[in-house]
């Protein structure tokens, strides 16, 4: 700016003015992140401390004032499904703490620890606070973040610095820009200050496989919405079924991208963002608006939803119908049409006796890899309207509840209208071999080919209690990140507390849970979303 901040306080104030400007311009909804807030503030912090005009108490107080500002930021008006499921989440401002510096050194500093203390003191659902953990991150910093997480209010989330950087580099970003980047919104990765990345909406992958089994006919709406590629009972081999699934995937991705491109063109022509363009690299030199392709990088993301559910569905069909011939496709379809009522034998086979993603089972996990690659290859590299390209990420926000509501019974034994799996997490109750098996299954996905993946884990408080529990939690994070996992977050709360909070919300007004890439008060969630959180598997290290 023309008048640069001279003090720590002024630097915080400048950020808040900038944040207000861009969010107000966009009414106020786009998940803007302040970037590496700890690294941006650190030079001012050191200067003021050395000058004797700032101590840690005052520095923390100013951060907490900023947190209050974030919390009071008016959220966009919710409508439709979003209003019903989670009407109170705010504007997804995401504070990244830790990571590395633009030249690759450890980025943790004194302000990083002050931000952790601020999170712990304030315990607000907004801003969305996370820590980025690199191989160079001190153990003390990770353990302090784990201490806060195990207190049971859903923050901070944990991100893999090296994975974030490689995701951006693999997408064509310069290394220095990638190191300055990180995660905003839910879990998506961007090159802050240089990239206009837009989340274009969600793709219901289990629904596409369901339509494949029913020859493009949608049981929910009673309409033919997919391609007619043949009745499932007529497929003689699994390869024939897979070929039909591939064609349906390509068809629905084409429909989605055509719609997205119309919207992007409308934004470019009718929705200029002058303030955002001023603070985004290359918009001025390119003489183009942020929404018209002026930024250095211009990415459009499509979010895949339900990878756990669809993996188990495909695995159940392949294992039981084609490999073991436990029953015919016709028998499975008939059981699904009746919501498995009166078809206990088929239900037991698909729900309890078939390979499941999330257990380090190569049979299921290789199917997950195939589905992921089909999804990735169908989307990644497609041109958008801003001179950039489409890429993928794997996150649901809350739409996994709605996506499940529009699907009747599925081939994995999931009953009609139940939520599908969220993020890259396994289907509820399918992961029976503990958290280590979960992260090993999840790590078989190519995270570095995405713009972000979301993994939820749930522990009861006793599992992460004491020094042993704390060390186990930190080790789980380090192990997952060593296998290129992008993100992991925790709900530390027991099932009975959640059930009681559902029945007696007046007694649990301050209960905060991690939903997807954000936290919210449990009492403010719609009942189906509350049920989904209650039903998540409670993990144990034993």
Question: Model-derived features: where do they sit?
Answer:
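Conserved catalytic cores of very large enzyme subunits
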Residues: 1-308, 313-542
